[in-house]
Amino acid sequence: MRFNTLDDMDLAGKLVLTRVDINVPVDGDTVTDATRITRIVPTIKDILAKGGRPVMLAHFGRPKGAYVPEMSLRVTVPALEQALGQPVNFIERPDRATLDALPEGTITLIENTRFSAMEEANDPKMAGFLASLGDVYCNDAFSAAHRAHASTEGVARLLPSCAGRLMEAELSALEAALGAPQRPVVAVVGGAKVSTKLDLLGNLIEKVDTIIIGGGMANTFLAAQGVQVGTSLCEHDLGDTARAIMQKAAAANCTLILPGDIVVAAEFKAGAANAVYDVDACPADQMILDAGPKTVETIAATFNTAKTVIWNGPLGAFEIAPFDAATVTAARAAAEETQAGKLISVAGGGDTVAALNHAGVADQFTYISTAGGAFLEWMEGKTLPGVAALEAAKPA
């Protein structure tokens, strides 16, 4: 994969349209989690250091092409100023003359791009208008790269364009995980339903050596093999699909690891009475809520011989103890191998990030993607419009 970075760009004296993701949670007028804001700081600082004037483009919420006061980006300005250590100039209705008049060192934020219906329609008129506001385009919003919108794809084809530092790090990590990985490659795929991971499994089978299947979706595969799963969450209607996936994996010489032992309970609540059974001995009135200790030992041993791990989804109902044990123990095993320099570990997806934070190891993986849908679509092998536009772009 080839794309320009900030290192390839001459930014001195130029207005740099910078697409960021600052779609952060708020409570009234206060940002409650500034993680996405702090992650864009290196890009903004580097643009300033190279003599450019960053003009940030971003969306906030889903206003559906209308002006919604509660979805104004103005609410993010205090958090941006705190993270960046300097004032941020907020402009509701930008024009080139106003931006040209800004002194060197100015950071600007333009109002919510989704206040115009032309944004999500990737309307050429809006892309052209945005392009008229800058000299260079920098995309630092991998999390929005799977959307072909005017501010993520359209404008990138009209200006010299590059990836910001966060985008660069994300693409480099994903390339290391799936593009040209060190082998053996192990994928952990968990979550509640097989139906949401069909494209993902189909793509991974062709690219990795082993897939560990956990969470509720493992029950569907077990049932497809004739295993009784009691009252567990299970998509029984996808039995044929699960069997087809297993056949495809066998043909591709991709090993599938399913739970060999299970943790069951009669109800899903904190501290519920639970027991460990071999996978073929699940009581009819119980539900599978986690993988058992023998399965976790198998997973840890698999990590021990792997060179690359890609993780998407928890191994059990990690939100409630004690059904978090498999996810926590396996995550710590992967983190330990990573910290020892033996493993490249890349993880992403909302539940995955929450699970790794719960295990206390999110900062011990090689890379944690907070991109959500874009991360999943990348793992599914789909083309991301925002990334494709950067690959086709010319440097400044």
UniProtKB/Swiss-Prot annotation:
Keyword annotations: ATP-binding, Cytoplasm, Glycolysis, Kinase, Nucleotide-binding, Transferase
InterPro entries noted in UniProt: Phosphoglycerate_kinase, Phosphoglycerate_kinase_N, Phosphoglycerate_kinase_sf
Tagged with keyword Repressor: no
SUPFAM superfamilies membership: Phosphoglycerate kinase (SSF53748)
GO molecular function, one term: phosphoglycerate kinase activity
Origin superkingdom: Bacteria
Pathway participation: Carbohydrate degradation; glycolysis; pyruvate from D-glyceraldehyde 3-phosphate: step 2/5
Binding partners and assembly: Monomer.
Homology family: Belongs to the phosphoglycerate kinase family.
Record protein name field: Phosphoglycerate kinase
The organism of origin for this protein: Jannaschia sp. (strain CCS1)
